[in-house]
């Protein structure tokens, strides 16, 4: 499943295609959304926001389309009039004079008013988004030490969208490698220095991935360009200490780590 950086880059791509342009045609597959087709035609997409792995497409009339890709959903951008060659099932089409965005295969799709946005179950449940530029390491540290999260092992906590939205498995293993911690650690047992390192890594690694992944020089390192240090690198040497990276399963997901320097 795509993680926060991939979802945000997808949102950027969609925004670049249709933001600020009049919608000339709107189509929804689900019956409960059909009444909104006429309400949105002639409106504009004002912005596309991410909340972890969910997308919020905001329209100029105050409505917002909530969509969660889950495992199989995918957005596409095409030239208006183009006929895509795909076996996927179309769920949403938002068309402008020159570009059209299409949502395929997703099933978790709703139209929300401004009031409903504040009470939506998923949006209420998710924590702050790691790609929100307003979120600080100090706020992350406070969440780590809060009664709700301080006793949780990082193996599960760093996959919990209620803690921080947008994290996922590759970010989990890369953040813990950067912090020299294992998945069994808990925030309550860390030193002040370890907490500070982890709090920064929880923001720095996702933001670096968003900014550079997919266009990186494989010889670059954290702090310059993003690339995997342990994810999918089991059996290889750890570039920090020379130990051999291992693979196991934690919280039902593959976990990669260096047992020599992650203590």
Curated annotation (Swiss-Prot):
Zinc finger FPG-type: from-to: 229-263
One annotated GO biological process: base-excision repair
Record-listed E.C. numbers: 3.2.2.-, 4.2.99.18
Domain of life: Bacteria
Cofactor names: Zn(2+)
Example GO molecular function: zinc ion binding
Keyword check for Transferase: no
Binding site for DNA: 70, 125, 169
Note describing how the cofactor binds: Binds 1 zinc ion per subunit.
SMART domains listed in its UniProt record: Fapy_DNA_glyco, H2TH
One Pfam family in the UniProt entry: Fapy_DNA_glyco
PROSITE patterns, sorted: FPG_CAT, ZF_FPG_1, ZF_FPG_2
Catalytic machinery residues: 2 (schiff-base intermediate with dna), 3 (proton donor), 53 (proton donor), 253 (proton donor)
UniProt entry keywords in alphabetical sequence: DNA damage, DNA repair, DNA-binding, Glycosidase, Hydrolase, Lyase, Metal-binding, Multifunctional enzyme, Zinc, Zinc-finger
Family note: Belongs to the FPG family.
Name the record gives this protein: Endonuclease 8
